[in-house]
Curated annotation (Swiss-Prot):
It is found in: Secreted. Belongs to the plant thionin (TC 1.C.44) family. Its main location: secreted. GO terms for biological process: defense response. GO terms for cellular component: extracellular region. This is Ligatoxin-B. InterPro entries: Thionin (IPR001010), Thionin-like_sf (IPR036391). Keywords: Disulfide bond, Plant defense, Secreted, Toxin. Gene3D superfamilies: Thionin-like (3.30.1350.10). Disulfide bonds join C3-C40, C4-C32, C16-C26. Thionins are small plant proteins which are toxic to animal cells. They seem to exert their toxic effect at the level of the cell membrane. Their precise function is not known. GO terms for molecular function: toxin activity.
Length: 46
């Protein structure tokens, strides 16, 4: 699951993923993070 700090970051992440890039690369580019669980930390719920 990916967790992003803002809607803008989420949009960047989603657009990056559409290009076929990996989750880790897109998370790094957008400022989002990949977690192993199912619930994002407070403030990372985008």
């Amino acid at each position: 699951k990916s967790c992003c700090p803002s809607t803008t970051a989420r949009n960047i992440y989603n657009t990056c993923r559409l290009t076929g890039a990996s989750r880790s690369v897109c998370a790094s580019l957008s400022g989002c993070k990949i977690i192993s669980g199912s619930t994002c930390d407070s403030g990372w719920n985008h």
